[in-house]
Amino acid sequence: MTAGVCMEKLDQICKKFEETYQVKAMAVSIHHHDRCVYTYHAGAKADTLFSVGSISKIMTTVAVLKLVEQGKVELDAPVTRYLKELHIPDERAGKLCVSMLLDHSCGLAGNCYQGKYGNAVNRRHLQQCIAYANQVRLKDTPGMCSTYCNDGFSLAEALIEAVSGQTYAQFITEEILRPCEMKHTDFPLHSLQEGKFLHADSGFDFDYPQEYVNGIGSGGIYSTAEDICRFFDHLMQGNLLHPATLALMNTKHAADHCGISAYSDARYGFGWDDVENPLFCQYGLTACEKSGGTFGFSSHSILLLKEQFSCAVTLCTQKGSPTLLNEELALAYLSETMPLVKRPVSNSLPKPCDMRKWEGVYAYNKGLLRLRKEMDHYVLELDENGTWVRAEKLHTDRSGALVSESGSLLRHHDAQLRLTAADAHVYMVLVTPHPLDSALKRRFVYAEQLIPGEAKKTKWQQLDGHLYLQDDEWLFQRKFAHQPLLIRPHHLEGYGGYLCLTHPLWEQNEREAVNTLRFPGTNAAEIGNLLWINEKELQYGMYHYRCADALPLLEEGEYRFRDAKVHWYRITASFEQLTCYGNARMILLDEKGNVLFDSIYMNGIHDVETACYAGIIMDEKAMVKVQLHG
């Protein structure tokens, strides 16, 4: 195939994706042997900056490894050797080594979000992450299991600053951006020039303003597809790391002491999401991949060291997978420019455990599932605040897996559920055909079975039936419309000792409920501990929650606060007029926590006569004026 025909094929793939998902903006870059061989842009120019999210972790990883090469850091050394202010109140914390920050096995909760995703810079976020780590127990033993963790890379960012004596941005600029001539990469430390970056769609009336991901080392860098490939070129050529160090970075490091990782697609290297993707392995190719996503942006990058090949996609859209687009583009280019021979690869699937162990309640970080037997089939149900809903009828196929009669299982087409045992636990493993090659099976450890137990009378039961609102988020935080602001603690019959939010926690004692899930990937990620303050107040992770029953009523008048934190009110009357002055913000929630109105992103209150809760946030010299209907 000629080069022109190959480029035409790549154009067709990009245009189809753009039209199918109504993409606001996208950029693609492909490099081969240190040369840009293909680009595609829609809704953006070559130098338009995208928020590339967790691709920032690759730069953080390279920065740590450069310090290792300089003899300033040891990968097997305890993190506290370099972060003197880190004092995690957990007897297991001494096992936390530098390398564990890079392969997601650090055991941290991973949910330090306060002030992280904002419309303004928060220069204290790193200090807040360390302060949070110093308040709570670890989620798991360091080195036990590689469960995706943003907080590990925030600590790596702090380590870079502590060891180098420079800010993270200064070190990355001097050690990576300048040597790689990455002229279109920046940090969320200042206002970017209008027209040089993209505004993501908010889902309300107005687009989001500039995004500030204040956890820069875990996901805050702005860049372009071209700059990402340029970075990878220099990495592959040995301009940033010695070959042996790069080989170490590109090696699978995912911890597997929980015994289930063999059936997980979480094949982490240092920084990388995947270093052994079967989609490429079947052609004898070793691809290292990293994706990224923030509110309104998503991205994906691929590096093939032996072939000196890199490919990057940056998107501004709420739809479509940058991973699948990038993988399709990479294979389309490689298949036309070099001889590829497809060979079968090991596609091992988990062996079903004893069927008598299948029934029960399973949990992951965003929900609870119940599997029960009925006559000649199984039923899978979802927990919704203590009520089992959305029953799905399943039956076993010839391989011993559960499949849905509807053809769709847990919103995945042609999926299987395999129930397998490891380390005395039973897990749900979701198996789906790869969208680009149906002969390949993708595997995700989806949920872990809870252990039944008799109910114990504890003060935690006093929380049942009550609603709690998160009341200490920051004025310019972007996540109000994206993360749950409400929690409804409840207990499950027959499962004493577990306190359920959207996911279960184990009632460690009368003051603390802790994580109970341990398996690799993302479905056991971002789970904090719950601390009892009193019956009306809780702390989950780093956030304070207040019982809705204890909230004051919203009344007419002027509201003035100076702390830039959200204050919640119950609403019993509809609005006649609402006015925000200065750096003030008002948010209305319905009883399920859905955002009905946000004064930053909406022109006026739409179709809302009476909401359930109002949040008022402001700093100095600001005011919110409320006038209610009689």
Q: What are the roles of these predicted feature ranges?
A:
Residues 65-70, 157-162, 230-237, 315:
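Short glycine/serine- and small hydrophobic-enriched flexible loop segments
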Residues 180:
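Acidic-leg catalytic submotif of subtilisin-like serine proteases
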